Amino acid sequence: MNKFLKEFKDRGFFYQCTGEENLSQLLDKEKIRAYIGFDCTAESLHVGSLLQIMCLRLLQKHGHQPIVLLGGGTTRIGDPSGKDKTRTILSEDEIEKNINNIEKILKNFLDDKDPETKPIFVNNYTWLKNLNYISFLRDVGKHFTINKMLSFDSVKIRLEREQSLSYMEFNYMILQAYDFLELNKKEKCMLQIGGSDQWGNIVNGVDLIKRYSNNHVYGLTTPLITLASGAKMGKTESGAVWLDKKFLSSYDYWQFWRNIDDRDVLKFLKIFTDINVDEIENIKDDNINELKILLANKATSMLHGEDEARKCQETAKQTFSENSLGDNLPTTQINKKMLDDNISILDLVILSKLESSKSEIRRLIKGNGIKINGQAISDEKFLITEDLFKSSLIKLSLGKKKHIKVELI
C-alpha cells in the first residue's frame, strides 16, 4: 500500500475511497494535487474542521500539494449535507470577511516554504460567478439524473422528514461536482478529500469528470469524529472550540485538549498531532495526565506556536497546582462604577460569560462549585466589593476546570 494511504489509515483518517487500489498505484508513481473544500458560513473554523486540516498536512508530509478550496460561491447557497433546515444566506461582505479570516487560520497549519507542496488557495466564486445557466444545464446538468440525486442522504433524509429542501440547495451537489471538474482542468487535481457526509457529492464529482473528459480521479473520505461522551467534535457545553484567538483564547484551546476524556487520548494523539504512530504506541501506557498535556501542547503548538503552548501549560500549573493567577488565564474586565450597582456573584458569573444560565449558577453555588480566589461562595446574593480585588484582580472559578481573571478597571 502507498505510504500516504497507509499513514492515512494508521492515524484513523480513513472511511471510504473510490478506486483505492488504483489511487495507491497513482500515489506511488507521482506526486499529485488533492483538494479539500471549506465552508465559509462563519468567520472562523472550529476543531470540527481539524481532521480535514490534518489531511492537508499529511499530504504535504508525503510530498503532495494540497489545494484549499474556499467556498465563496457555494456558501452563497449552503450545503444541505447534515442539515435539517435551510441555512441563513450571508451577505457578500460577510462571506468575503469569512474567506479572508479562514485563509489566515489555515496558513497557521500549513507549510509554504517548499514550492512543490505549498498550498494553493482557490475561491470557487471565481468560476461559479460567470456560469451561463443554459450552457451549464446542457454541458454539466445532462450528466446528472434526478433518480440518483434523490438517493443521496443529504436530500433523502430531508424529504423523508417532510422538511423543505429548496431548489437552490438541491443544486449544491452539482456545483460541488463542478468544482472538482474545474480543479481537474485548471490545476490537474486528482483527488478530493472530505468528511463522510460528503461521500455522495464527491462521487458525483468523480463520475462527472469521467463522463465529461474521460479522466480518472479519486475520492477519499474521513470518518465523523465524536468524543467518548458521544458529543460531536468541535462543540462543548460552553460552545464551539474555535480556531481563531478572537473567539477562543489559546489557554482555553489548550484546556480543551488537556480535559479530553481518558478514552480519547490515544486516538486523538494519532489524529490531531504529528507524533509518529509507532511512538504513540510506545508511550500508550504512560501516565494518562502526562499524555493529555502532551496532546494539549502539540495541538496548541500547531495553531498558536510552541511559545504560546508553553505559556498555556505554565498558566495551568500556576492556576491548578499553585492556586495563583496564571499569566495566560483568560481575562474579563469590569468597571469600578459597576460595583456601585451591587453586583452579586450571580451577576459576575454572567458578566464574565462563564455561564449564562442562572439556574445552573445557583446549582453550582449550592454545591460549592463557584469560588473567588479559591474560596467557595455559598450565597447567591454575595456582593462583589472592591476589597476582593488584589492588585485589581480576582480569580473566578466554576468547578475544577473553568477559571478566569476578572480585572477591575
UniProtKB/Swiss-Prot annotation:
It comes from Pelagibacter ubique (strain HTCC1062). Disulfide bonds: none annotated. Belongs to the class-I aminoacyl-tRNA synthetase family. TyrS type 1 subfamily. It is found in: Cytoplasm. PROSITE patterns: S4. Its EC number is 6.1.1.1. Residues 343-409 form the S4 RNA-binding domain. GO terms for cellular component: cytosol. L-tyrosine binds at Y35, Y172, Q176. Catalyzes the attachment of tyrosine to tRNA(Tyr) in a two-step reaction: tyrosine is first activated by ATP to form Tyr-AMP and then transferred to the acceptor end of tRNA(Tyr). This is Tyrosine--tRNA ligase. Its main location: cytoplasm. GO terms for biological process: tyrosyl-tRNA aminoacylation. A motif ('HIGH' region) lies at residues 40-49.
